[in-house]
C-alpha cells in the first residue's frame, strides 16, 4: 500500500489535532482523529471506555481501532497512548508516514493544564514526568520523522509536516 497518509503521534498537548486539521486543509486531505473514531465505534466517550475497561483494556481497544484504519490521502491524529499498541503502530507505519510532534516536558506541562480534563490517565503512582519519559523512546522508535515543535509557530510545523510526502 502506498504511504499517502500522514500519521501524527506525540504527547497529549503536542498539537496533533490542531496541526492535523491545518495540514489536511493545506494538502487537500481528509482529517481523521482516531480518538473520535474510537468514541464513534464504541458509542462512548474515552473516559467512559477507560472506566469500563481499565487503562490497559482501553489500550487494546485503541490498538484494534488504529490497526483497522484504512484511510487514504488523510492526516490521522492519534491518541497519545497509541504507541502502546505494536499492531496499530506497524499498520500505521505501513499506510502512512508517521510524524512525531516532539515537545520538551516543560512545554507539555504548560499546555496540558488539568490532566483529567484532557483525558490523560496515569497509572497508580505514576507522574506526568514518568509517563513522558516512558513514551519518548516509543514515539522515537515508531516515527519515520521527528518534528521538534519547541518554540515553533503552527505554520512552521505544518510546513515541515507537509514536506514528508
Q: Could you tell me what each predicted segment is?
A:
Residues 8:
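Hydrophobic anchor at the beta1->P-loop junction of P-loop NTPases
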Residues 14:
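ATP-binding Walker
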Residues 17:
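Walker A/P-loop
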Residues 11:
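P-loop (Walker A) phosphate-binding loop of NTP-binding proteins
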Residues 1-3, 22, 26, 136-165:
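NTP-dependent small-molecule kinase module
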Residues 94-137:
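A glycine- and Lys/Arg-enriched "phosphate-lid" helix/loop adjacent to the NTP-binding pocket
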Residues 36-82, 86-91:
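ATP-dependent small-molecule kinase phosphotransfer cores
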Residues 25-36, 44:
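Post-Walker A helix-loop "phosphate-sensing" segment adjacent to the P-loop in P-loop NTPases
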Amino acid at each position: 500500500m502506498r504511504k499517502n497518509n500522514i500519521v501524527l503521534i506525540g504527547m497529549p498537548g503536542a498539537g496533533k489535532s490542531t496541526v492535523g486539521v491545518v495540514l489536511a486543509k493545506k494538502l487537500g486531505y481528509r482529517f481523521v482523529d482516531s480518538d473520535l473514531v474510537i468514541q464513534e465505534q464504541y458509542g462512548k466517550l474515552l473516559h467512559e471506555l477507560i472506566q469500563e475497561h481499565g487503562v490497559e483494556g482501553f489500550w487494546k481497544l485503541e490498538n484494534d481501532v488504529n490497526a483497522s484504519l484504512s484511510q487514504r490521502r488523510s492526516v490521522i491524529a492519534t491518541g497519545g497512548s497509541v504507541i502502546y499498541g505494536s499492531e496499530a503502530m506497524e499498520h500505521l507505519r505501513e499506510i502512512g508516514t508517521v510524524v512525531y510532534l516532539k515537545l520538551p516536558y516543560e512545554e507539555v506541562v504548560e499546555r496540558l493544564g488539568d490532566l483529567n480534563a484532557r483525558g490523560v490517565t496515569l497509572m497508580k503512582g505514576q507522574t506526568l514526568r514518568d509517563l513522558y519519559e516512558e513514551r519518548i523512546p516509543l514515539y522515537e522508535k515508531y516515527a519515520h520523522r521527528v518534528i521538534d515543535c519547541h518554540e515553533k509557530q503552527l505554520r512552521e510545523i505544518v510546513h515541515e509536516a507537509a514536506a514528508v510526502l
